Amino acid sequence: MSSITTLSQPANQPISVLGGGWLGLPLAQYLQAQGYEVGVSRTTAAGALEVSQLGLNAFAIELAAATPLPDSAFWHAPTLLITVPPQRGKAEGEQLAQFERLIERARASGARQVLYISSTSVYADDEQLATEDIEPAPTKLGGIMVSQLERLLQQETSFRTTVLRFGGLIGYDRLPDSAAAVQRRSRAIDTAMNVIHRDDCVRIIHEIVRQQAWGEVFNACADAHPMRRDYYAAAARARGFALPDFGPVQPQPYKIVSSEKLKARLNYKFLFPNPLDIFEQPARDVL
């Protein structure tokens, strides 16, 4: 039985965005433009000042494993959106401890709902259609880490957690624009892509908040899943650069991630349903 809640959250309700980076900052700006009272965090005072100069309520917050997180107005919003990715090079136990401190602070501050930005890397590359009903079986360190963080948040009973598993994030400065850029990214060239444009990420998060779709797990990837080789070819045609020689096709294990549940529950239509078309379309102004 689904535990989803589908009421509508008033647009003036406070929301806190933990992590004002590549996704979190434009998300905070978009939510503020929709009428929400938004707080957003950066890890340093200098970073918080930079964000505040954009007209956002900014806070310097760095997750710590050994000490409790100090209280601040940031933590007193009923809705907390966690956009902090796993930290490369940091021990698994330390990252879990950081999230335990985060949960303690959210509980003490009265958070009612949490959205955790996870990843489709929780699914194995085993030729499957990956739906939310499949038990995660990550094989890479990043996927193992986010899977553990998902469980940690879902086990907490003082607030309701929705897990949002994004595919690879693309758009803006995360699009191949030269042969050198393609060469740097030319791993797994003959596998299907599970990606999502940042504009879609922002809109989907807003719909989850607006519709109060809490206590759920959603996958979020573009409808089409082109081979990476074809994606790079589309970029080269649109941007006028020559592709490096990838050699013959060498099929490799991959997965196809389904977003049908998200589209049905949120009545969501992707802005960029086919990654191959992104190079021909300007990015939407989500603000």
Positions of the model-derived regions?
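N-terminal Rossmann-fold NAD(P) dinucleotide-binding loop
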Residues: 24-25
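C-terminal amphipathic/interface module of NAD(P)-dependent oxidoreductases
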Residues: 61-64, 250-287
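NAD(P)-cofactor binding segment of oxidoreductase domains
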Residues: 75-115, 148
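Conserved Rossmann-fold NAD(P)-dependent oxidoreductase catalytic core, especially the SDR/UDP-sugar
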Residues: 100-139
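Conserved beta-loop-beta element that borders a ligand/cofactor-binding pocket
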Residues: 148-172
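Substrate-positioning beta->alpha
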Residues: 165-166, 175-178, 185-209
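Mid/C-terminal beta-alpha module of Rossmann-like enzyme folds, strongest
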Residues: 202-259
